């Protein structure tokens, strides 16, 4: 599918995946997929009742940062590009008069989850990392509260979140994208399905963090 066709079908997409590679040229020329990323996030702000996810792998997060998607959120990227991401975040914050992104060193980072976390002191899955590149608060995994399956989603709550509740997932280096993909399988299908995928792949799922909420 080319970019022109992607724009035509954008309203039908549930997940937009942004891989890394070639980011310097894209940012310098302000070319695609920067416009596509922005258009996808604008769709969510206009129609927050729909559940959508933007998911970057490796240096793809630099493109999300350049598009202004990560302002005020937490995110990660390939560790060799932390300094570059900080630089982009600073430039974008000045350009858009927006908050900076909090860059943390994790396998993956998930923002704008479906349900409120509640009191983090009562949840053993919330942790404060003192050894991260920056201190970060997040919960390992995606299944801390099974009772959240009974919660009713609120469109009003989703609309009040940044980007209209667009779920934003950034992952580190290439294999971190596998871990983040397993997270997506767990929330969109089931934890059991994600576990079965790891069995078939003979892969150990290394979980990242989720920020200020839960998905299941």
Give the positions of each predicted feature.
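Short gly/ser/thr-rich secondary-structure transition/capping motifs
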Residues: 1-3
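Active-site-adjacent pocket-lining segments in enzyme domains
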Residues: 9-216
């Amino acid at each position: 599918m080319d970019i022109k066709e992607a724009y035509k079908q954008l309203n039908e997409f549930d997940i937009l995946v942004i891989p890394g590679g070639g980011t310097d040229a894209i940012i310098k020329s302000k070319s695609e997929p920067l416009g596509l990323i922005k258009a996808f996030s604008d769709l969510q702000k206009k129609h927050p009742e729909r559940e959508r996810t933007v998911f970057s792998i490796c240096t793809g997060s630099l493109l999300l940062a350049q598009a202004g998607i990560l302002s005020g959120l937490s995110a990660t990227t390939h560790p060799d590009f932390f300094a570059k991401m900080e630089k982009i975040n600073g430039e974008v914050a000045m350009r858009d008069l927006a908050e900076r992104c909090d860059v943390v060193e994790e396998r993956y980072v998930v923002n704008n989850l479906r349900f409120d976390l509640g009191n983090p002191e009562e949840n053993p899955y919330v942790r404060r990392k003192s050894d991260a590149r920056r201190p970060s608060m997040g919960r390992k995994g995606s299944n801390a509260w099974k009772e959240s399956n009974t919660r009713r989603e609120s469109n009003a709550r989703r609309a009040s979140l940044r980007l209209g509740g667009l779920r934003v997932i950034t992952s580190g280096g290439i294999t971190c994208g596998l871990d983040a993909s397993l997270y997506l399988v767990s929330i969109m299908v089931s934890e059991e399905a994600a576990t079965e995928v790891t069995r078939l792949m003979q892969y150990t799922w290394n979980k990242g963090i989720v920020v200020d909420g839960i998905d299941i």
